[in-house]
Amino acid sequence: GIDTDSFIAVTDTKYEGFVPGEIKTAAVPADMVEGINIMDNSTVTLVLYDKDVNGNHKDFAHVVGDFNNWTLSNDEKSQMYRDDASGCWWITLAGLDAGKEYAFQYYVGTKEGEVIHLADAYTEKILDPDNDKDISASTYNENLVYPKGGVGIVSTFKIQKDSYNWKYNDFKIANPEQLVIYELHLRDFTASSDINGAMGKLSYLKAMGVNAIELMPVQEFDGNDSWGYNPCFFFAMDKAYGTKAMYKQFIDACHEAGMAVILDVVYNHATGNNPLAKLYWDGDKTAKNNPYFNVEAPHPYSVFHDFNHESPLVRKFVKRNLQFLLKEYKVDGFRFDLTKGFTQTSCTESTASNYDA
């Protein structure tokens, strides 16, 4: 398996000479969550959590994107407010087009010269300057144009999300204790290596007596060619297999055929392209002050960057992600990868399977 990060090399000259202004403070508007908040048909509030294990935060946070022509400024178009009570930076963007997809990223850092170009961890779609160009139009027939102002991976949002009319809103597994599960990797299952190909083989699976399909990880992972155990954006489905609508069509078709859909999910670790890792980084690993990750895994199954599963922030993130997948995609269950890594107790190969209360 892959166990090294696949970083996108970038050279940042676009914002040379920009001097961030003094921090402006204001309380985060009521009922906001971290990430992208749709307020109305023309307004979005972006919320970025930034409070390390020592209670400190970055010295500045701005946002750049299609909505401000990728231009940094110390005003309401780019500079984020700071709310120490919540530990968040935030900004409300007005005058947006409800039907337009906007690309954006955060620009955060310190007075000592640290600058981080950060996508939103909660985005449902990323644009990747290195890998999107290799995805065929037959697999992904929606916008993949990378913005000229971006630096590395960028996130997106759209106020008026594309609707999908589910045929099966309340699918129930007929015999949950008698599942015949087929573990399916979309890349390897058919010649087209995507959802379109898998859709054409559902009758084959049904004829074999399969009543549940377990999709190997489909949340956005580094690159396009992987088993998926190198996740980076947990709320975005990987575009190498298809669009959001195609994923929903596949799940709907499975339900129509009487087959449940189980997602293989990876919450033991994330790659360095994950924004929660990238925000607090040191050399080639997560920094000691990162509130989401361990510097080194306490267990012997270390791959990529190990989540601190006792962190309230991690538990909140995982719970929110699972709820999102259930509601947005109507999946029927989950297979949790590498659960022996869900620990903060130091262990070895011989003790890793011990009960950990």
Locations of the language-model features?
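Surface-exposed loop/turn motifs at beta-strand-loop junctions within extracellular Ig-like
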Residues: 1-2, 108-110, 219
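Substrate-binding/active-site clefts of carbohydrate-active enzymes
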Residues: 127, 141, 163, 167-176, ...
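Exposed beta-strand face motif in extracellular beta-rich ectodomains
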Residues: 1, 100-104
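Aromatic-rich carbohydrate-binding modules that target alpha-glucans
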Residues: 46-99, 109-131
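Non-catalytic, glycine-rich low-complexity segments
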Residues: 3-57, 141
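N-terminal carbohydrate-binding accessory modules
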Residues: 30-45, 49-51, 135-183, 206-207, ...
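Core domains of carbohydrate- and sulfate-ester-processing enzymes
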Residues: 104, 108, 112-168, 276-296
